[in-house]
Amino acid sequence: MKRYALFIVMAALLVMMIAVGSAYLSSASRGEERHPMQEFTAYTSLPAEISASLAEAYESEYNIRVHFIQLSSEQILKRLREQSDAEQNTNAALVLADRELLDRAAVAGYLVPYISEKGDQVAESFRHPNRYWTGVWYDPIVFAVNQDYLRTHLDLPNSWQMLAQQHDIRIGTTDFMAADASSNLLYSMIAEYGEQRAFEIWRRIQPNIMQYSKYLHTPVRQAGMGEVDLSVAVLSETLRYVHDDYPIRVLYPVDGTSAVIYGTGIAFRASERDAHAAEVFADWLLTDEAQIALAQRRFYLLTTNPMTLSYQMFAGKNISIFRHRPYFSKEEKDILLDRWIKEVRFYEE
């Protein structure tokens, strides 16, 4: 708990430093209406609250407006295809989305390579080998454990294998049918272990699951309230409850875990001016300033940049991420979810 308290204190200090600096810079132009020197368009599949917090912070500091357009993954690919087929440079300059979408866009030729000093600092596992995209954040699946359970049990499950072997434990998790981050865990385990072993792990875990929740935050709240002993949850939601002083400790599966990785790519056929502005913004997303902008709105995504203070002071920075990418077609995903329903959730011997 002390490690997370230090994380929160340091984040608060960083927020104060940025706030003081911003207040000083804005005092000279107080009363004057500011107009952005430039603006460009970015496609994103992230929640509007996240993109809005980033855009507001960036425009306030650099007077450049990022016009985010929220779209689904398929809609983004459709827009990029149309832009790629156009005869002139127009439309979006940046894509801010999950790794799978960026990989698909790169293969289709909808992105152009971008190399920078900031991007070079990111581990190879978080970026495209030919630099068509660079990861900026990741949100892993972790074990959120109630502190009372910790005090009464010595054999803490710190791996999927151990969790599957536990008997005296109440588990909470989000329904694989309810959220992409949750179903991504199932697909990732299948990609990493194979179908047989992945389903066997979940068959053993199933009897201890008290409830499948609809939302990502619900299992974390249940662990904090003592309604379950351990929840399988996304770290971003877990850190929100840790920040609110819920009695939760985070355990990172030592045998690996899934993570949603978010990154940036520069769109093909963006104008040279917009592409350059998008590159500068993409680099800014790899800074502590961007992390502070997110933390001020209670978004706790982990940065991929090891040179930032945010990364260096976080205790879970060495978490092991599954190596194999969970890329399945929509039809394959439907089949896997249907099998999970029949062979795990509602399976009767």
Regions flagged by a language model, labelled:
Residues 7, 21-104:
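Early extracytoplasmic/lumenal segment of secretory-pathway proteins
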Residues 100-104, 224-225, 229-247:
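A ligand-binding cleft/hinge motif common to bilobed small-molecule-binding domains
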Residues 139, 171-177, 201-206, 212, 244-268, 284-307, ...:
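Periplasmic-binding protein-like
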Residues 112-118, 132-134, 161, 246-258, ...:
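Short beta-strand->loop
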Residues 45-49, 74, 89-92, 96-220, ...:
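Extracytoplasmic ligand-binding site segments that recognize negatively charged/polar headgroups
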Residues 311-349:
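Extracellular/periplasmic bilobal clamshell ligand-binding domains
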Residues 144-149, 261-274, 293-294:
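A bilobed periplasmic-binding-protein/Venus flytrap-type ligand-binding module shared by bacterial periplasmic
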